[in-house]
């Protein structure tokens, strides 16, 4: 369990994990189980940052959370926006996403996301960041459960065929968040609904999901939950 968790941590963050992997193609399909568990780490960083009154400490924890975790998904978020909002064929959208060039859609919505995140970081209860970070990573499992790979290569394709039992196993890591039934219920419903809708959109745009889409969905769910939990 610890071995797989560390591999999962290294897979969806910038934290270097130097572990020799045996039977990689088999083991990598188990990694999504631990995605929600990984989400507790940036969630706790943002929680502490939001709890401190000192402005410099707020900045420090924000940088740590983004540098080691959220920036990893922010890249996918930007690529997904540029690809999905481009009025062209599925093949062209996939090409745009694979190139990774930052286009106007990515610049605008990426900037908007950061501004909204920063505003909420200063205003809403810090505990909401734990919920949003954990459920944001959980959304990647839901998206894989609902969808299929858009192409046969790439990081996203490694997890397919997605083992349905992994969704159940990963759900156990949500249980500590039951201490607030209201936040848990809202987070769960929003995450499931958004992930399902995202799978429909992604299938329509590019014929499935990619690693960029998974990362983008994680960040979109994260931001959406912060907005929703911040107003309830």
Swiss-Prot record:
Its main location: membrane. It is a multi-pass membrane protein. It is found in: Cell inner membrane. GO terms for molecular function: adenosylcobinamide-GDP ribazoletransferase activity; cobalamin 5'-phosphate synthase activity. Its cofactor is Mg(2+). It comes from Thermosipho melanesiensis (strain DSM 12029 / CIP 104789 / BI429). It comes from the Bacteria. Joins adenosylcobinamide-GDP and alpha-ribazole to generate adenosylcobalamin (Ado-cobalamin). Also synthesizes adenosylcobalamin 5'-phosphate from adenosylcobinamide-GDP and alpha-ribazole 5'-phosphate. Keywords: Cell inner membrane, Cell membrane, Cobalamin biosynthesis, Magnesium, Membrane, Transferase, Transmembrane, Transmembrane helix. One of its GO terms (biological process) is cobalamin biosynthetic process. This is Adenosylcobinamide-GDP ribazoletransferase. Its EC number is 2.7.8.26. Pathway: Cofactor biosynthesis; adenosylcobalamin biosynthesis; adenosylcobalamin from cob(II)yrinate a,c-diamide: step 7/7.
